[in-house]
């Protein structure tokens, strides 16, 4: 896996699924291929995107700034600076300075990532902030190692909270989680269907699932009633994907 492919993989792991994720993936590919060289326009586009957390926007802004050639005096963007300030916690800033000193001694992507992984996401974001604000300089490869370590910490935390959600014993939480997952799967089916001739069935299944979830939320039902909802949807999606010759990896 090339360095830029690895960076793209890690960055996209913290972006919520949906049409915006596909759009961001395309922008990253264009930037890494040298096809998009207008940093100002890119940053303005990023700033106004919905759904993304401030930290995710900050990380993407940092990656764009590292990659797109720009005039030396180009002004730094406030939304990126605010996102990469470690929540204003002085402890994060102290750790960021210590990490920065270690990163200065690193020359490889993997070396930098390994060093950075022992720090919290807050300290890592602060360290990115130091570099973004030109208070310190490291090689692009080392900066990318820092980016990927930060994304890994965030993705691990999201994964842990997802696992806790799945294994929780509270039936009301599990019920709501099943409905949320069913809605997400329905959305995935609609996105995959597009305008193909075989799409009618997938759209119909997705539409029925949405109506069922809406009805459950509106009138209230027993928590066990949603147990098969997500599984039925996934089975329908898998059957549809087999017919379309699409692999199931994205929506497991």
Curated annotation (Swiss-Prot):
It is found in: Virion membrane; Host nucleus. Keywords: Host nucleus, Membrane, RNA-binding, Viral matrix protein, Virion. GO terms for cellular component: host cell nucleus; membrane; virion membrane. A motif (Nuclear localization signal) lies at residues 101-105. Residues 1-164 are annotated as: Membrane-binding. It is a peripheral membrane protein. It comes from the Viruses. GO terms for molecular function: RNA binding; structural constituent of virion. Residues 165-252 are annotated as: RNP-binding. InterPro entries: Flu_matrix_M1, Flu_matrix_M1_C, Flu_matrix_M1_N, Flu_matrix_M1_N_sub1, Flu_matrix_M1_N_sub2, INFV_M1. One of its GO terms (biological process) is viral budding from plasma membrane. Belongs to the influenza viruses Matrix protein M1 family. Homodimer and homomultimer. Interacts with NEP. Binds ribonucleocapsid by both interacting with genomic RNA and NP protein. May interact with HA and NA. Cannot bind NP without genomic RNA. Plays critical roles in virus replication, from virus entry and uncoating to assembly and budding of the virus particle. M1 binding to ribonucleocapsids (RNPs) in nucleus seems to inhibit viral transcription. Interaction of viral NEP with M1-RNP is thought to promote nuclear export of the complex, which is targeted to the virion assembly site at the apical plasma membrane in polarized epithelial cells. Interactions with NA and HA may bring M1, a non-raft-associated protein, into lipid rafts. Forms a continuous shell on the inner side of the lipid bilayer in virion, where it binds the RNP. Determines the virion's shape: spherical or filamentous. Clinical isolates of influenza are characterized by the presence of significant proportion of filamentous virions, whereas after multiple passage on eggs or cell culture, virions have only spherical morphology. Filamentous virions are thought to be important to infect neighboring cells, and spherical virions more suited to spread through aerosol between hosts organisms. HAMAP family: INFV_M1 (MF_04068). Most abundant protein in virion. When expressed alone can form virus-like particles in transfected cells. This is Matrix protein 1. It comes from Influenza A virus (strain A/Turkey/Ontario/7732/1966 H5N9). The lineage of its organism: Viruses, Riboviria, Orthornavirae, Negarnaviricota, Polyploviricotina. The gene is M.
């Amino acid at each position: 896996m090339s360095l830029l492919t690895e960076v793209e993989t890690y960055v996209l792991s913290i972006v919520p699924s949906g049409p915006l994720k596909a759009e961001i993936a395309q922008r990253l590919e264009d930037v890494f291929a040298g096809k998009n060289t207008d940093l100002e326009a890119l940053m303005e586009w990023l700033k106004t995107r919905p759904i993304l957390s401030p930290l995710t926007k900050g990380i993407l802004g940092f990656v764009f700034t590292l990659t797109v050639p720009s005039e030396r005096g180009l002004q730094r963007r406030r939304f990126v600076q605010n996102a990469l300030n470690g929540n204003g916690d002085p402890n994060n800033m102290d750790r960021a300075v210590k990490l920065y000193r270690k990163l200065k001694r690193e020359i490889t992507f993997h070396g930098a990532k390994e060093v950075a992984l022992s720090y919290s996401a807050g300290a890592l974001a602060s360290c990115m902030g130091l570099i973004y604000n030109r208070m310190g300089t490291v090689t692009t490869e080392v900066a990318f190692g820092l980016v990927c370590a930060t994304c890994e910490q965030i993705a691990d935390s999201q994964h842990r909270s997802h696992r806790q959600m799945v294994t929780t014993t509270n039936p009301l939480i599990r019920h709501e989680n099943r409905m949320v997952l069913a809605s997400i799967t329905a959305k995935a089916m609609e996105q995959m269907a597009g305008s193909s001739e075989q799409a009618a069935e997938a759209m119909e299944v997705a539409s029925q699932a949405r109506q069922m979830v809406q009805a459950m939320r509106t009138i209230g039902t027993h928590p066990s009633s949603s147990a098969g909802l997500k599984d039925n949807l996934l089975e329908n999606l898998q059957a549809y994907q087999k017919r379309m010759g699409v692999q199931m990896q994205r929506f497991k």
